[in-house]
Amino acid sequence: MKKSIFLAAVAFMLMSVSASAQFMQSNGGSKAKASVEDVFNTVDLTYSPVTMKASYDGDSATEDLNGLSLNWAQARLLTDQLPVYLQYGAGVQFTWKTDTSSDDYYDVKVKNTTTFLTVKVPVNVLYNFAIPNTNLSVMPYVGLNAQIHVLGQSKTTTTYEDEKETSKMSYFSKDDMEDPYKRFVLGWQIGAMVSYEKYFVGIGYNGPVTSLYKNGDFKIQTSQVNISLGIMF
């Protein structure tokens, strides 16, 4: 299903490019290209609700986490005829979740914190729909996103009366896990940015191509929604 959505998005962008080309040819094209930059950069802060999905033999369970990332990207014009760009960049994302439980009768409190630190390398095809007679542009994109997990761990703190005990487990360490998670994960993404002068907001979705963890029929994959606020220069 998700692969079908990705392919449909690619087809939609190709049809949009073709339609825009015909429109520009019938209307001269020079005015549309006047506002197009050959190269532009973006820097944004992105909040991402992250879903971690575990699947086995047709059954699945999900866990929700929070993600916050700082990202840079550069877009380069691919052709003088159309505002089609190759966009590439890098970002750092911190993902976390905290669960707490307690037993008042025994005076026991348990706090578990899951954290991931991830380097992201996106590569997109982006189209710049400049709205005539305004400073607004709508820029849909579709592409791939490589994720390199630098850190991934679970920290559990148990408090009993005045005593506290802490334990940690790394998801990527063979010392802590017999079959550790994958540090490199590939995903696909689709979204759009709306810019006004040098500012923009963005909304996007990342889906999985490869799994964070896989053992036989059991696998763990992640997906996320991206809500961005940034500047262009």
Regions from the PLM with identified roles:
Residues 1-26:
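Bacterial Sec-dependent N-terminal signal peptides
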Residues 69-73, 122-126, 191-193, 228-230:
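Outer-membrane beta-barrel architecture
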Residues 21-77, 232:
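Short glycine/proline- and aromatic-enriched beta-strand/turn motifs that initiate or cap beta-hairpins
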Residues 47-53, 74, 90-98, 117, ...:
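Transmembrane beta-strands of outer-membrane beta-barrel pores
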Residues 39-45, 84-90, 119-121, 138-144, ...:
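Transmembrane beta-strands of outer-membrane beta-barrel proteins
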Residues 32, 93, 175-233:
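Predominantly the C-terminal beta-signal and adjacent terminal strand-loop region
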Residues 37-41, 62-68, 94, 111-121, ...:
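Residues that define the transmembrane beta-barrel architecture of outer-membrane proteins
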Residues 49-63, 93-116, 150-182, 211-225:
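Flexible, solvent-exposed loop segments that connect beta-strands
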